[in-house]
Amino acid sequence: MKNLQVKLKVISILLFLLVLSQVLLSETRGIENGKRYDRLVIRDVIVINGNGTPPRGPLDVIVEGNRIQSIRRASLERDAYEKEEHVLDGKGKYLLPGLINIHGHIHDSRANQSLPFEYLYKLWLGCGITSVRDVGSNYDKTIEERRKSQEGLVDAPRIFLYMRAWGRSPEEVRRNVQEVKKRGADGIKVFGMDRDILKAALDEAHKLSLRAAHHVGVEEIDAWDDAEFGITSIEHWYGIPDAALHGSQNFPHWYNYSNEDDRFRYAGHLWREADPEKLKKVLKRLVEKGVAWCPTFVIYEANRDLLRAMNQPWFKEYLHPAIEEYFNPNPAYHGSYHWNWSTTDEIFWRENYKIWMAAVREFSKMGGIVGVGEDAGYIYMLYGLSLIRELELHQEAGFHPIDVIKHATGNNARILGMEDKLGRIRPGYLADLLLVGDNPLENFKFLYPDGVQDLKEGKIISRGGIEWTIKDGIVYHAPTLLKDVRKIVSLAREKQQLKE
């Protein structure tokens, strides 16, 4: 009996040591915020790729420097990575390609108040965004910020800079596009152009291997012209329903496009005026010509539900006072037009969304490339957080969550011309990744900083929140980044109170 008790104790100790060794070996170790390592192991993780395929795993993903070196079945051997110095424990977690924000603005001020780049960058990284296509900012500053990001001198996403092309004649716009190329831009953004000037701008861009994004205003050009002249992507939705009209939109006689209250109110009437059969032809033509569509559903959401937009829960901790001031209705600020916004306006916009979302879905079914962007810093939308909301809106539009992830990763990489380097978890690709504790395919809200509240065994628990964001092999602890953002906001509010 005594020998049996001794044996049982020995067995218990051995089992304890075995379990302890497994726990120790699976723990995250040797990881510091903001560091890149010669070799990093992300162990025992479920991979959601950016190519539209379902989750796979558990897998071990090996990163060397800034590249994904290998992906293999998770090792079941206890000591497989015993000698590894830098390990992220992925057990029960999900690894995705870093999110790409295809429509961003790197603002350095709002409402005539300075806005630190650090605030934007850490919000983006904290929300899993590892690349941003900037389509409008202070270009001299942004070129320098891009250099710092490339060299790892600042904690920031990758920056792809699309500078505005302009000109009062075809000759002038060609010279401007050439200058944009010389300054090192990755592409051009065009808007507010007559047809002959747009044609010249895009022709010159093609000669110089520059991609182009188009914010189509209410102009003489529309999506037919974008297809003919070879635009890379249409931003928002302008120009697409316009191309399916028979003549002009039914504007009232007193309408003034320069009055943004008029502009956005009657934009909410446009989709219902588009001829459905003609619209299908427009979409088909865009697909045939390889034009991508970046709908940015999120930036107009205030138009269909203003009170929701004004009272987003993260404003409490993450809304910088400069942006808060900018969001207040003010005709001097672009996008701050919600004065006397009515229930009727919201009803029109809700119908607008239904038709618009159906069109994006039809475009995708035809083979069109749909991208994900946020356009934050305007109309009550915060950087990073609004991109996660955009994922939810793509799901609302009828896309499967797997396809939504593809929109924000693989598709966006294609729009950038970086599909051989970004947007997928694949050996040889750049190590832009995010690790989250719960499955975003179950609920995109798991990607928000605070995750979601759930019920387990009669108790309310928190689930979700991105744990780690990896950009160019540099490992960032997302909660630490977001803590820094909260501190920036708190200090800015204190400074503002002292002024008052």
Task: Indicate where each model-derived feature is located.
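Active-site neighborhoods of metal-dependent hydrolases
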Residues: N176-K182, D186, A244-A397, V489-E500
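C-terminal cap of metal-dependent C-N hydrolases
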Residues: L430-R486
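Bacterial N-terminal signal peptides that target proteins for export
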Residues: K2-S12
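Histidine-rich, glycine-flanked metal-binding segment
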Residues: R29-D38, V47, N51-L96
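Divalent-metal coordination cores built from histidine and acidic residues
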Residues: R29, R36, D89-G104, P116-V218, ...
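Divalent metal-coordination and catalytic microenvironments
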Residues: V45, V61, N66, G92, ...
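C-terminal helical cap
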Residues: V45, H338-F348, Y353, M366-I369, ...
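Bacterial N-terminal signal peptides
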Residues: S12-V23
